[in-house]
Amino acid sequence: MRVLVLGSGAKDHAIAWWFSQSRLINGLFVAPGNVGTESIATNLAIDPSDAKQVHEACTTNDIDFVFVGTEAPLFTGVIDYLNERGIDTFGAPNRALKLEGDRNFSRMFTDRHNIPTPTHVLFDDEHKLSEYLKRHEGERFVVKSNAIAPSRVMIDSSDYNSLMEFSKSILATSPIILEEHLKGLPITVTLFLDNKGYLSLPTCSDYMKSEEGGLPTGGMGSICPVPLQEEVSQALVDTIIEPTLFGLKAERMAYKGVLTISVIITNRGPILVDYHVRFNDPAAQAFVPLIKTDIVDILNAMKHDTLSSISLEVSTKSAVALVVASEGYPGKPIIGKVLDPMPASLMLNTFEGAPRYYFGGVQEKDGKLVTTGGRCVTVVGVGYNIMNANKNAYNGVKHVNFEGAWYRKDIGDRFFEN
């Protein structure tokens, strides 16, 4: 099999690395890729959101299968375009994209199928929003754009002025969803879907703020697996996963591909926060190093609707993923900073037990690695428990150095007692 992965972030580097470990592929391409993927695959300088360019690349390079890692190609119709032309690819078709791309649609879907979600209200008028907030003075809310937007585009606050100022900036282009603030443990549930069942990947817990109580980001770290009590795991299946899959089939939105569910474990039980129709970053960087099953075996099972028969082989170890970001992120990152040289052996991710390095906002320029975005490198430590994995991740981050680099110092801490 000859495979093309669409994307250029750290998540896509991790996915490409997973494919590179397969015994069943004889060609691996990434579009457009990055400095990390070029050592394990052939990077293709095309726009992954342009269906015609992707199709032409598949034809030119005899590509059999396309894996959509990043969200942009999903929302430009790449999957439907390729499937119509006989190229295998799995992922949410246009009819299912509203699960992620329209939060109000998603909330109505969960309401129809009795899936627990935060209390929520849709607003398209700032005056009505203002009146609502004044009636609930002092309460803490989360405000997000109704349309698809980066996860850092949100606010979690009890301050009227802050909530209104943020909401006005969104309402110019999209309605907003106002939700109750939930207290609890955030987890990320990742599923492969086919027409008859699903395969659950190791559950992660992501750190989405710049610091505890800080600004929202695209994700600053993740741990895997999450130590959940058996009754909580069963509640996830009974109240969220199974009703979601039933709803997808009932509403003719079922598809073969990835579904990621963001959940908060509260004292009321698991509550669904968001759906994503692709892998999440940085959860993917955390779970990929732990999975021993060949990804092509999983995809073949998906193709033949036999996912439920797959016994996923997962390491008994733990992983801690740590994101190194540019100064200024999550606001306006200061880019163009040169990374200190890294040993080639580390960049290749070839040594068992060594930290993994997955590259995001970094490009090679004049023989040097230069930052090009907010989140630059994800360092993943693997260890016999979360504490040991944490130690390995923070030892590994010492090799990622550039002016203004920063990262959270507490990834995994909340799980040490377990």
Give the predicted meaning of each segment.
Residues 153-287:
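Internal nucleotide-binding/catalytic subdomain
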Residues 237-259, 276-354, 364:
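Active-site "cap" helix and flanking loop/linker of ATP-utilizing ligase/carboxylase catalytic domains
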Residues 1-94:
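ATP-binding N-terminal substructure of ATP-dependent carboxylate-amine bond-forming enzymes
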Residues 38-40, 98-104, 211:
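Short, charged, surface-exposed secondary-structure boundary motifs
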Residues 4-5, 100-177, 195, 227-242:
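Active-site nucleotide/adenylate-binding loops and adjacent lid/helix of ATP-dependent enzymes
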Residues 12-13, 74-76, 129-130, 163, ...:
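Short, well-ordered alpha-helical microsegments
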